[in-house]
């Protein structure tokens, strides 16, 4: 019998299994694919990225970048594989989608303390367990979780289309990263005013894949379908995912009226995704409307954009900040991780997997689970989703979660950039002390 069972081989489950195994526990990692498929996955690999191939900003002076740096310093297997399979993406950490997932699968699956079991979990396992089945939890397990929680919440999420590189017109697109930061890693499709408004009109009126009427507004605000943004007003897109600022066309020296950006999706550069163009348009409509974009008139689609329902828990009424279920609901040593807990984002899901896996291993060894300090981005996220008043909405890492730095000695506030830099320094300092004093040196050193 394993010391810890982890259900779900996504980002959070893979991280949880790895951390429990690092702590010396025998781990069974259950993944139902390919025995039972989901509406959004295309492979049976662990940590398959079903939406964007970007893990967010690299800089530790951004909230997303700080979270990644915390995980790196703690020895995250997901960040190790992401860094090893990075593709050009300007200031973001973009990864070669399949190479990254394959690396996680091989790394996690080859750990001597981890046994991979390909099966559907129809009930909650006995003993210390981490449920990290994500937003596409199977119906049978979903019912068992609802018996514990009394309810689950949900929203809709969508993925952007992926194009074949050789079908993109190089005489129209140009390479650039916004404000010239880093390498010129993005392909940019420039639009003039007339083309832009014609495109927005067609996009806003295009035929959608059906969902129930009452579900039409149940989207995560940070990942809205591009057609939903278009319906909010004719200029909304060019101040959002199609904003041209910092992207002058080298042929004219001027910024276009609007820009559609394409980001490399694989290591070889054969595939590019349309940045910020998650959609629930019917596939035929995606071809028709997106081929109106300059440079994409003959674009061939490797994958169309798709939409799926994301389930998450009322963690503020159900979980402790350790990711353990509250004793009032169950005295079982049961932990939850990933998007199922109400965080939004690949790295945020990974962070909750790290916490849950570490604490499941502690309980298996007869120790109490531990809370991450709130001065870290990891701890602040865990605290927010487990203490939020009212209805919990999915949340990304953001600076509002961690303590602000003190003002200058003269009482004046710090500038924005200096404030973020100091917040990051404070958080990483707290993390280093926590890792050395509480997690113990073997974990802190990344062994």
From Swiss-Prot:
GO process terms (BP): tRNA methylation; tRNA wobble uridine modification
Transmembrane spans: none
Catalytically driven reaction(s): uridine(54) in tRNA + (6R)-5,10-methylene-5,6,7,8-tetrahydrofolate + NADH + H(+) = 5-methyluridine(54) in tRNA + (6S)-5,6,7,8-tetrahydrofolate + NAD(+); uridine(54) in tRNA + (6R)-5,10-methylene-5,6,7,8-tetrahydrofolate + NADPH + H(+) = 5-methyluridine(54) in tRNA + (6S)-5,6,7,8-tetrahydrofolate + NADP(+)
Keyword Ion transport included in the entry's annotation: no
Cofactor(s) for this UniProt protein: FAD
GO MF annotations in UniProt: flavin adenine dinucleotide binding; tRNA (uracil(54)-C5)-methyltransferase activity, 5,10-methylenetetrahydrofolate-dependent
Subcellular location: Cytoplasm
Recorded GO CC terms: cytosol
Stretches with biased composition (Basic and acidic residues): 406-417
Primary localization: cytoplasm
Superkingdom of the source species: Bacteria
Broad class of enzyme this protein falls into: transferase
SUPFAM superfamilies, per the entry: FAD/NAD(P)-binding domain (SSF51905)
InterPro entries the record matches: FAD/NAD-bd_sf, MnmG-rel, MnmG_N, TrmFO
Function noted in UniProt: Catalyzes the folate-dependent formation of 5-methyl-uridine at position 54 (M-5-U54) in all tRNAs.
PANTHER family from the UniProt entry: GLUCOSE INHIBITED DIVISION PROTEIN A, METHYLENETETRAHYDROFOLATE--TRNA-(URACIL-5-)-METHYLTRANSFERASE TRMFO
Designated name of the protein: Methylenetetrahydrofolate--tRNA-(uracil-5-)-methyltransferase TrmFO
Originating organism: Rubrobacter xylanophilus (strain DSM 9941 / JCM 11954 / NBRC 16129 / PRD-1)
């Amino acid at each position: 019998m394993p010391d810890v069972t982890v259900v779900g081989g996504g980002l959070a489950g893979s991280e949880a299994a790895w951390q429990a195994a690092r702590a010396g526990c025998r781990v069974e990692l259950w993944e139902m694919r390919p025995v039972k498929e989901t509406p959004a996955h295309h492979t049976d690999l662990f940590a398959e990225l079903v939406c964007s191939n970007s893990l967010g900003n690299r800089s530790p002076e951004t909230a997303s970048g700080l979270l990644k740096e915390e995980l790196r310093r703690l020895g995250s297997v997901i960040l190790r594989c992401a860094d090893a399979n990075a593709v050009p993406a300007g200031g973001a950490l973009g990864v070669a989608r399949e190479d990254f997932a394959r690396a996680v699968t091989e790394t996690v699956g080859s750990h001597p303390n981890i046994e991979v079991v390909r099966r559907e979990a129809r009930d909650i396992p006995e003993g210390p367990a981490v449920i990290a089945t994500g937003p596409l939890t199977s119906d049978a397990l979903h019912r068992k979780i609802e018996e514990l929680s009394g309810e689950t919440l949900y929203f809709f999420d969508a993925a952007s289309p992926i194009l074949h590189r050789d079908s993109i017109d190089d005489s129209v697109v140009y390479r650039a990263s916004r404000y010239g930061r880093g390498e010129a890693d993005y392909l940019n499709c420039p639009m003039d005013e007339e083309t832009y408004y014609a495109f927005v009109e067609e996009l806003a009126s295009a035929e959608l894949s059906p969902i129930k009427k009452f579900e039409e507004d149940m989207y995560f605000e940070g990942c809205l379908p591009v057609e939903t943004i278009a319906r909010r007003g004719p200029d909304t897109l060019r101040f959002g995912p199609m904003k041209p600022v910092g992207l002058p066309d080298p042929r004219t020296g001027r910024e276009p009226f609007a820009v559609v950006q394409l980001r490399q999706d694989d290591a070889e550069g054969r595939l590019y995704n349309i940045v910020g163009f998650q959609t629930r348009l019917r596939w035929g409509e995606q071809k028709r409307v997106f081929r109106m974009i300059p440079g994409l008139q003959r674009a061939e689609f490797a994958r169309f954009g798709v939409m799926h329902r994301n389930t998450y828990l009322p963690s503020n009424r159900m979980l402790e900040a350790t990711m353990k279920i509250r004793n009032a609901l169950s005295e079982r040593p049961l932990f939850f991780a990933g998007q199922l807990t109400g965080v939004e984002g690949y790295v945020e899901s990974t962070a909750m997997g790290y916490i849950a896996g570490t604490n499941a291993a502690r309980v298996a060894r007869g120790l109490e689970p531990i809370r991450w300090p709130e001065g870290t981005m990891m701890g602040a996220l865990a605290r927010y989703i487990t203490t939020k008043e009212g209805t919990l909405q999915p949340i990304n890492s953001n600076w509002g979660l961690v303590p602000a730095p003190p003002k200058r000695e003269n009482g004046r506030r710090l500038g924005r950039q200096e404030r973020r830099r100091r917040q990051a320094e404070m958080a990483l300092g707290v993390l280093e002390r926590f890792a050395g004093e509480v997690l113990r040196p073997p974990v802190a050193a990344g062994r």
